[in-house]
Regions:
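Short hydrophobic alpha-helices and adjacent helix-cap/hinge residues
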Residues: 1-140
Length: 140
């Protein structure tokens, strides 16, 4: 799909062994970057994705900032530990008798940006200093 001069290639995967081919296709299509959405499957296989994108020199962007600490290029979104704390509070309320049907849905209110400059250097990418100064975490 083309949006504002960019072409978005969307690939759904349902099993771990399906992760590699879309990354290879991104390289073959000279994709500018790979945006890895937050899903249990992709999170479980994040190390596979990180290794493969690094080997192919594809910039990788994740929905969890922690992924940049694990070797991904960039992560932007709620911190996983904050999400788990909120989930824990909701579970305690439900176990304490609150009805799940009447329980409000809590959206993250705090987002973080993590940039891995080491990964950027390894794949030959320069990150603009104007972006780096806004990062919550910079991995060098």
């Amino acid at each position: 799909q083309r949006r504002r001069g960019a072409i978005f290639l969307v690939h759904a995967v349902e099993k771990g062994e399906e992760i590699g081919p879309p990354i290879d296709m991104a390289k073959a299509e000279a994709a500018a970057a790979l945006n890895v959405l937050a899903s249990p499957l992709l999170h479980a296989y994040r190390h596979v994705i990180i290794r493969k994108t690094a080997a192919l020199h594809i910039p990788d962007i994740y929905q969890w900032p922690e992924t940049a600490h694990e070797g991904g290029l960039l992560g932007y979104g709620p911190r996983l530990d904050d999400v788990m704390r909120q989930l824990g509070r909701q579970i305690v309320e439900i176990l304490g008798g609150a009805s799940p049907a009447n329980h409000p849905i809590h959206q993250p209110t705090k987002l973080a940006l993590a940039i891995n400059l080491k990964t950027a250097k390894e794949i030959g990418l320069t990150i603009a200093s104007s972006l780096v100064v806004h990062a919550n975490d910079v991995i060098e």
